[in-house]
């Protein structure tokens, strides 16, 4: 049916169009609102885009069994849902709920981005099977998860959970308020983990666990306006010190060299493969003791050349070590 006075069109079986300029051009479809349309244009007629629903001023439904509800809401793929003012769903089986929420990306000519879910005002799930939950969240990588206000997961299979949590790089995990995980390596040199408020981990296979724990050092870039327009070109995290296979466990624990281990509150490692055990412990450069002369006899110690060091305290905060067996002396 066509109403010349309002330019309203319902041109298919069981189609409904209500509102100035509303158009419903496929079977079992509903368009309600000024300029609302279901499969408008010559390319969208017939069964191919059946059972679409567009409700709201300028709402658009272009895909089988899709739903767009809200002023300017739109879906462009099959089985998709867009709910909220200017919500957009461009992913097959995608969901966008919230004002300005986005599921899928605008330039996806091969239709690789599917099953993405964005829930929250300005939430964006641009990666295939990505999930963005919360206001201003961003799941860019495929199979990535961002949950929490302004949480961003930008790497493939990355996870960011917590307000302002940020993960970047394949398999990186950031959990906690302002937690940051950045992997910039290739191949198997990925998968960094930062868990705890303001925890930081960068490099490759490094772990920071605890409030303000650090495995490497990061700088957070906060220019959202620039990043929002160029999500693939501008990074939000910048590595100041990258470390590999480092582990920092404890509040404010810090490892700033490869393969180091800091265990305890404010434990600090600044030497390659160094180990700091206990609160406030800190490593120093290793000192080798190859031998010792006693009563004119020279004794060579096994392991006389030290590769690194283990610290159980620091200057002014020394600890005794108990229940330790005697060391070995070599046969020569």
Tell what function each PLM region has.
Residues 1-332:
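Glycine- and small/polar-enriched repetitive beta-structure motifs of secreted/surface proteins
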């Amino acid at each position: 049916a066509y109403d010349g006075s309002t330019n309203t069109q319902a041109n298919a079986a069981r189609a409904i169009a209500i509102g100035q300029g509303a158009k419903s051009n496929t079977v079992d479809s509903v368009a309600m609102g000024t300029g609302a349309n279901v499969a408008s244009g010559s390319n969208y007629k017939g069964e191919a885009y059946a059972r679409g629903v567009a409700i709201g001023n300028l709402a658009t439904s272009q895909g089988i069994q899709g739903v767009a509800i809200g002023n300017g809401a739109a879906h462009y793929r099959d089985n998709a849902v867009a709910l909220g003012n200017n919500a957009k769903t461009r992913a097959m089986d995608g969901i966008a709920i919230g004002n300005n929420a986005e599921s899928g990306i605008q330039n996806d000519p091969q239709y690789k981005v599917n099953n993405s879910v964005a829930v929250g005002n300005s939430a964006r799930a641009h990666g295939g099977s990505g999930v963005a939950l919360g206001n201003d969240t961003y799941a860019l990588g495929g199979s990535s998860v961002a949950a929490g206000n302004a949480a961003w997961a930008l790497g493939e299979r990355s996870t960011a959970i917590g307000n302002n949590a940020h993960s970047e790089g394949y398999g990186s995990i950031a959990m906690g308020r302002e937690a940051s995980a950045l992997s910039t390596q290739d191949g198997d040199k990925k998968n960094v983990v930062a868990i705890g408020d303001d925890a930081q981990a960068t490099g490759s296979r490094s772990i920071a666990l605890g409030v303000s724990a650090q495995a490497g050092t990061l700088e957070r870039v906060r220019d959202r306006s620039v990043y929002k327009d160029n999500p693939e070109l501008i990074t939000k995290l910048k590595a100041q010190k990258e470390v590999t296979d480092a582990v920092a466990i404890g509040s404010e624990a810090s490892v700033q060299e490869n393969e180091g281990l800091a265990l305890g509150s404010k434990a600090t490692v600044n030497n390659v493969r160094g180990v700091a055990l206990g609160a406030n412990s800190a490593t120093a450069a290793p000192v080798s003791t190859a031998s010792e002369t006693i009563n004119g006899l020279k004794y060579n110690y096994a392991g006389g050349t030290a590769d690194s060091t283990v610290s159980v305290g620091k200057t002014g905060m020394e600890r005794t070590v108990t229940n330790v067996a005697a060391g070995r002396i070599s046969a020569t």
